[in-house]
Amino acid sequence: MDNYTLALNCNHTTHGYAHYVYSTLSYLVFIGNAPGYPNCENCIYDITFNSTSMLNISNNYFHIANATLGAPEYPEQPVTLSVIGEESPWVAWLAVHTPDKNYTEDANTARAVMRVLDPFNISWCAVYNVQSVDPTDTQDISNCTEVSEELPVNNQKSSIHLNTYFLNSTFTVSVSLNASNISSQCSGNVSLENMTSNVHIPCPTLPLTVSVKASTDNMQTGAAVNASIDIGWLLQNLTDASLTVSSSPGNLTQKNCTTYKNISKTDRHVRDENLYVLAQIPALEGHKDSFTLTRSPILLNFSRNSSEFQLVLYDRNSSCVWANPANGTDTILVSMSCPHITATISPRGEIKVNVTGNFSRNANLSLAFLSSKGKEYAGVLLQAFEPSTRPPPGTVAPGILSTTANFETSTNKSSPTYTPTPAKLSTPPGLTNTLLLTAGEHNSGIGSTLEPLTTVSVQVLQTPSSPTRDTSTLVIKLTTVPQDHKTVSPSLVTPGRTSTLPIVSMTHFSREGSSPKPQTTAAKTSSEASLPPLLTTTPTPTNTEKSQSTFASSTVSVDTTFTGDDVNTVGTMSPSITQTLPITPTSGRQYIVVGCCTLNRRSGNLFFFFLFVAAHRESGHNTSMPNPHHNSVKPEDHPHHPEGDHPDADHHERFQIWLLPIAGTIFALVALVIVNIALRMTE
């Protein structure tokens, strides 16, 4: 594989220069365009290096598997992987030695390529134009100020404050390292042209990474700039080391030089507190472990609570980093260069990422989520995205039926109340209707004890797709599921672990020109299921009117008393799932949409399941609705039409008799799959 092919097989590729010195040990350092990656149990970093110009590594590949952060496991491995600082990029570096200057390289073809495949399955490549440089003269440090205080090295990183410089100025920075086995230096010019500057200075003969950071709040020429130099220590076993740092303005009339001989190294990382478990998301479809993911906007639900975390997103040309300050509040965080990506992060676990840029179909967007404390999870998405076409939050696009839940609960002993926020639907006739179920937020005090009474009220607005009568049924079922409950059946019945409540209220939509009345009965046995008259096997004949009302609405209220220790203490309500499925009402078919939101309790979760059964379309004759509990229709449940009715009535009836049981069975299986997926995504 040549250098170009290797680079093309990377998700992210950077270009730069690799400098080396003849007859001297040189360090080729690859700096990853990413924040510092965490320590992982059994993390694998696959590192490949190839060069066409260096004698001792010409046309060779070095593949490192099971590379760990820090020193390599095997001394013969030429590449070392390490993390500089707690938040700074990780680096992969290679020590090379070119013993002879007789080897000449073509400046147009002398290249080196390093490829790193990280534990998130993101590939990073650096393509270097290789250049040889002459050794620099040893710096005169006789006039430098020797500092007796310690120079701390925390997690292989040191930061040294420079004297104040000014915007639009240029100065020179030099670094010298003297140790028992190393004595060399490097220097570079730094130009402060922007409010924020981060200049990397290549030091090929030093096992150091050197960069200068500067920032100012004033863009006027001559404004004071705060500057510092960051030193990354690649080697950890240096003895009798001293570091000299000097800086001077462009006119060289002034020079500030400091020597540090007391270098103290510490490592603040506690491995047991910085372990990560990786969860791969290879595509939009399929099992996503602890995550839910939808397009436009990207919705990433992280099911575990975490007070501090990082969210890292990359496209091909830039990287973005968000970090939660752990202040316990919802925060919209933006940083670095993210012109096409914004993120809203809730410390209660929900992350919404909006991608609005003109990403091409061939572009990759890498999405990585890192939690910073404890054994948390990380995920990655490598997928091409197009600009977002969804409306802003809080609005409903044409063809979207939205039911939004807002939980409001006081800390005194009162009932938590579900307050519906209805949304109008304006679907033109014949277009697909969509039921969109979203959850609001509940901010009750953790562990506050409330009366064991919960009232749930849902309001749904529906636009019929034709002037004929449409009848729909909305079914609400409540149950409690323990937090450690992994799988449930569609009925959510698990003996000894789940308290299942019967359906206590049902309603229907009608085209009678007025809002239908909810049918509410007392809770009965599961066989009776509190069915309203609409769903009884003996239909009541009615005269169908072709009303031209805009929409019909209905409200379903459920009042029930919860018992048991697992449901009488309210925790917090967090957004859980937004499940969107298309519904196209068709005569004689059932369509079921399941959505749920979660009310977290101390030892259990309260799930609200919404089942929407699409309308039967009646055309001058009576048709009973199928029983949604069984998701099937018996032939004897349908009345026979009298003679003299529509000539196609008998054929239509026989069609429904055979079609409905098949459709019911199919959609029962669909409901089972949706419920299980929804529950997995809320874990």
From Swiss-Prot:
Residues 633-648 have a biased composition (Basic and acidic residues). The chain crosses the membrane at residues 657-677. Residues 407-427, 509-556, 621-648 are annotated as: Disordered. Residues 531-542 have a biased composition (Low complexity). One of its GO terms (cellular component) is membrane. The gene is A8. Keywords: Host membrane, Membrane, Transmembrane, Transmembrane helix. It comes from the Viruses. It is found in: Host membrane. The lineage of its organism: Viruses, Duplodnaviria, Heunggongvirae, Peploviricota, Herviviricetes. It is a single-pass membrane protein. Residues 407-420, 512-529, 543-556, 621-630 have a biased composition (Polar residues). This is Uncharacterized gene A8 protein. Signal peptide: none annotated. The keyword Transferase does not apply.
